């Protein structure tokens, strides 16, 4: 099990020796050990540590925005007789003042299965690794990223997960082999933790076909049988924070964030299925960068919305169950009206 209190994973023992030398006054030995310890830190750990420096402020709950969101949700739930309040998970971050972001949420801290929304996280991790020099965004990788985000290909997603984890989940593994497999597949989660995001589990492929034995083993967290306790999960608040970092060019660097947002741009004129999602509720002249997710029991969207006047907000709406109505679109439309009124 990883030591959650280590500054760099796998280095606690090394730095303890350095600290002991410091306490006993053996400065020369301590400096030598410090150099050795730093040189032997995994490259990935340096990237994680550096990534956590200078992140944008976390959003604080705004009573005013919360009251507005509660009214909007209540109004739209009344219009949907086939949608229960417990099925709705929602978060809004207002970025009007980037240094004082405001948060409101509705069941937004409850974890749900994110379906294809998780793909935006895998995209972010690939760009992070590219920035660290671990992999290269080749034309083939770029094509797979496009297929994963735009048409939301599960096949492309599986390829991307295998790329960053250097694994293949076809066959079941021995306990020793499984431990290494699990470590590799949880690399994306370690990156998220370095960003301060703890309420996302991003380690599984997205499936639209039979699941191989090795992947089932991982879904069961290594057990030979039983429930899938290791599924991908996400809260609306955590998804919104992830998108806030993307919107503020803090997820990786500006060039990478620009490329990611470009992949996520939505246009209802060319993507008719977006009419019931966030983009469907925004006026002409707005820009929406989002990732949807749909299965037999999920209907999600998570996006960055930039209004014609330049005001930006994050909106994540996860709906569980078989509902397929206009709730997401209508909430998006009402939030647009609210923010425009606030500016007048």
Give the ranges of each region predicted by the language model.
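Bacterial N-terminal signal peptides
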Residues: 29-41
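Active-site-adjacent helix/loop patches that line small-molecule binding or acyl-intermediate pockets
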Residues: 56-76, 140-221, 234-237
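Short, well-structured active-site flanking segments
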Residues: 128-145, 157, 253-257
